A protein has these predicted regions:
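An amphipathic, aromatic/His-enriched active-site/gating alpha helix that lines ligand/cofactor pockets
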Residues: 59-89
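Short, glycine- and small/hydrophobic-rich beta-strand elements in well-ordered beta-sheets
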Residues: 29-53
Length: 109
């Protein structure tokens, strides 16, 4: 499974519905679980800044991640941005692989 991060900004009219926030959030999560049962949520945070929420979740592929984003946009999000997260150890492995290739290519000159 791949790790994804979803940053959302709610539409202004939805942001004003503070008393209904828990219900709206539960409805969104239930819909995602129904439409994307393969997605596993890891963390959910409310943010102070340009985005309202950050979700960290695992999904098998980019198509599943796109569905989560589209469900968010169809249910009150004004903006949704999905990022793929690479585990740090895996990232370090990529840097070693690239370094070897760069070194090999530079010796070809």
């Amino acid at each position: 499974m791949k790790t994804f991060i979803l940053l959302t900004k709610l539409a202004p009219d939805i942001s004003r519905q503070m008393k209904d926030r828990a219900k709206l959030g539960r409805n969104w999560l239930d819909l995602v679980k129904a439409k994307c049962p393969e997605v596993k949520f890891i963390s959910h945070y409310a943010l102070l800044g340009p985005h309202d929420f950050l979700d960290i979740y695992e999904a098998p592929d980019e198509e599943s991640a796109a569905k989560v984003s589209m469900i968010s946009l169809a249910n009150g999000a004004f903006q949704a941005e999905t990022l793929i997260a690479i585990p740090y150890k895996q990232f370090l492995g990529l840097t070693k692989e690239i370094s070897k290739q760069v070194k090999k290519n530079s010796s070809d000159f």
